[in-house]
């Protein structure tokens, strides 16, 4: 099955310079033991955290750290990320072993 990643790029309004990184980031370890998303996921989690923290500081420059921390936690948790993933049908682009 061939996946059209350009549709995903349109949904997120970003064109990847290196499409291989996109494919690797969507490849589960069960599909490819060597070239999968584990290290990219590790890095991506940190990048997401930094971007969210920076944006919160820009939007709420006078807010107390405790409030910012709660807002941050609500934005980077699994539930929020899952909702965003579903909204762009990310499951249609993930490579995972399926023994049907």
Predicted regions and their residues:
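RNase III-family endoribonuclease catalytic core
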Residues: 1-100
